[in-house]
UniProtKB/Swiss-Prot annotation:
Entry function: May participate in the coupling of lysosomes to microtubule plus-end-directed kinesin motor.
Keyword Membrane: yes
Superkingdom of origin: Eukaryota
Name assigned to this protein: BLOC-1-related complex subunit 8 homolog
Record localization: Lysosome membrane
UniProt keyword annotation of Repeat present: no
Keyword annotations: Lysosome, Membrane
Region (Disordered): 152-183
């Protein structure tokens, strides 16, 4: 019986090994699936974070593309408005030129006004600087005329002669010159 026991023992051991191998083969796919499930569970949050980051980058890229398109449109409208800017530049040049002309005319009028005030007598006296013949003394005639005028105007004004009248009555030639330069 020893031989029978030994055979039973070996058969039992072999059947256990076969059973264990069958069990391993039967559970091996489930173990593989368990390992895959573990891996997916660990990697999924990182994948979702990357997915969100990609969506955010896509939105940013789309916004930058819109900005670039708006910039291109703005540049095209600026290129189209070149003629308008040239017209504005020409108008500015014309207005600067007109302003300079007005300034020149104003300064010319001012100089002319100043020169007419001061140089009329100078210009006329320059002509008189030539050798003029001696004029007769009109002092007496002028005194008589001034007295007649004072008498006609009134007796109160005869004594109130101005300094200019007194100065001109002493030198009748000067009076004559000044009257001619003012008219």
């Amino acid at each position: 019986m020893s031989r029978g026991n030994e055979l039973v023992f070996k058969a039992k051991k072999t059947s256990e090994k076969i059973s264990e191998n069958i069990h391993i083969f039967a559970n091996d796919p489930s173990l593989a699936f368990f390992r895959v499930q573990e891996h997916v569970r660990k990697v999924t949050p990182a994948i979702f974070e990357k997915r969100d980051e990609v969506f955010q980058l896509q939105n940013n890229l789309q916004g930058h593309c819109y900005d670039m398109e708006y910039g291109i449109q703005a540049l095209r409208t600026i290129e189209k408005s070149e003629s308008i800017f040239e017209n504005i530049q020409e108008m500015i040049k014309a207005s600067i030129f007109l302003k300079q002309q007005l300034k020149y005319e104003e300064s010319r009028k001012k100089v002319k006004k100043d020169s007419t005030k001061s140089s009329v007598y100078k210009r006329f006296s320059a002509h008189l600087a030539l050798d003029l013949p001696d004029l007769p003394d009109f002092g007496g005639v002028m005194r008589e005329t001034s007295q007649r005028m004072e008498n006609m105007i009134g007796p109160g004004t005869a004594t109130g002669r101005t300094e200019a009248q007194a100065a001109t009555s002493s030198n009748p030639g000067e009076l004559q010159r000044s009257y001619t330069t003012l008219h």
